[in-house]
Amino acid sequence: MPRQHAIEDYRNFGIMAHIDAGKTTTTERILYYTGKSHKIGEVHEGAATMDWMEQEQERGITITSAATTAFWNGKRLNIIDTPGHVDFTIEVERSLRVLDGAVCVLDSNQGVEPQTETVWRQGDKYKVPRIVFANKMDKTGADFFKCLADIVDRLGAKPVAIQLPIGAENNFKGCIDLVTMKAIVWNDESLGAKFDHVEIPAELADQAKEYREKLVEAAVELDDDAMSAYLEGTEPDEATLKRLIRKAVLSGAFYPVLCGSAFKNKGVQPLLDAVVDYLPSPLDVPAIKGTDDKGNEVVRKADDKEPLSLLAFKIMDDPFVGTITFCRIYSGILTSGTGVVNSTREKKERIGRMLLMHANNREDIKEAYAGDIVALAGLKEARTGDTLCDPNNQVILEKMEFPEPVIEIAIEPKSKADQEKLGIALAKLAAEDPSFRVSTDHESGQTILKGMGELHLDIKVDILKRTYKVDANIGAPQVAFRERITKPANVDYTHKKQTGGTGQFAAVSLVVEPNEPGGGYVFESKIVGGAVPKEYIPGVEKGIESVLGAGVVAGFPVVDVKVALVDGKYHDVDSSALAFEIASRAAFREALQKGKSVLLEPIMKVEVVTPEDYTGSVIGDLNSRRGQIQGQDMRGNANVINAMVPLMNMFGYVNNLRSMSQGRATFTMQFSHYAEAPANVSAEVQKKFA
């Protein structure tokens, strides 16, 4: 079957925002107006089409980014709904990785919120072209112009209004389109499906003229001819202005800002027009780079004629189809039944069912093309971030980076039957979400779950209980401490064992030094002249790595350390890889002692938004949690307090804050860095764990 839509008519975009800015509602309206949903789903009724896991419908937040295809004005929209809660930042990160553009949704009452900053920075990291939608214009306190100011102050970006609101709060009627200089007013009776283009209301004419000028001036700066014409008194026509706004979006010169109220069905159709007019097609963004099987850099252009390459960006377990792998096809054509190679894992796979997803409905397809986002059923080996490609033209596309988890809980199944179910369920959950890790504590035999925050782990436990029917006891959350050495250490160690027959002999000299923060573990062999034969060096590495998982302070993983093997001795008969493994293990443990290992604890960046009356109590409480206040500023009539606080002092903070502020203060927290724990904390942790 030939391609139905030319690749320049594709818009692969995500909707990103802070929690509760109305992202899922905006997506729902998009699906409704593009004719994909016959009934609008409301988030607060737990009926939104995109939020299809029970946990999402109950909590009214979006956890997994479902991919949906819709059509508008002859263009094909592939929409990825991303979560706005800080514990699910990983979902946003991997969505942005496969998108070409994004709509950033703001709550007009709140402006730019902490998680907006986080997702915006992720957008900057992947250079994603963006447009901004100031939503909830019908809410009390909605202020479109505050949103514009916030984008400058908090995101350091240049916003340009391409619409202005007509009225606000209860009187929000519609918007003025500054490109066409017409007003758009929605008809309340038709669920927003009908609207009229009318003249700009007289009382807003001056304001519209002022902001139209700002828009034109920002746009003509991007084109010499348009600039010359403008200076001579000729304004750009509508087509030229749209072309220049598109150019600005693609280059990040400025970000067009629109307004509306998705919940009240106002402003969604012009937002869709803006997605089509201004966001990039796969041809407008740089072609993806990768490395071929010889390690050379190669480029895969968005073209059906190029060799096949696709990236798995999400894995989900579907009750009807089994494992579904969401993939973005970057180049070539994918046909069901063909063989591909998972070049990341060097495994062959056969493409079985191919599905086009609409939230949680699905349509079987036989072929997919460059630019498509498809769901593949039944892949056995694929994990998030893997590349699948043509076996004869192998490539590994740019890898995704995933953050380290900072919080962990122990989980114990209640019965033998639960034990088996738990193993299967955890393997599936870990495959779906790379920021969720599962490990076993060798000493206690407990299963440990690690994640990005309390909510992240709460939801995983909830899925285990509901979806997989596992009955288990859950331990209290624990902090993921780390250890590192603070000074260099040199160690010589000899391992000897003579017990008749073949003995064991190995001698190693290690130089162990601190690496810079975030530098990780680095091993280097500086052996010259065969003091330790090549075949034994992997044994040395294995011995060192066996200690990295449990350091000498309190048995936590060792990070940021450089180890060099500088000398050694061996015996022709008695030496073996195992003997060198034992020797290097003991030598490295000794080096960790000598190098004055210390305990590191995760420090969280905390932002509290509180009415002014409670500021003193909030700051006092953060100080009592060993928090360091970084600064305060006013946002509207609320005070915003930024602090760095150790994670171990933040458990249960949500309830404390609620009672301290009568439920009026809110906070967000995300991992910032690891820092050395004070001596008293270290002693307490050692007593508990060592």
Curated annotation (Swiss-Prot):
Residues that hold GTP according to the record: 17-24, 81-85, 135-138
Record-linked SMART domains: EFG_C, EFG_IV
Domain of life according to the entry: Bacteria
Transmembrane segments: none
Pfam families (UniProt xref): EFG_C, EFG_III, EFG_IV, GTP_EFTU, GTP_EFTU_D2
Molecular function as annotated in GO: GTP binding; GTPase activity; guanosine tetraphosphate binding; translation elongation factor activity
PANTHER family in alphabetical order: RIBOSOME-RELEASING FACTOR 2, MITOCHONDRIAL, TRANSLATION ELONGATION FACTOR G-RELATED
Similarity remark: Belongs to the TRAFAC class translation factor GTPase superfamily. Classic translation factor GTPase family. EF-G/EF-2 subfamily.
Name of the protein in question: Elongation factor G
Gene source species: Bradyrhizobium sp. (strain BTAi1 / ATCC BAA-1182)
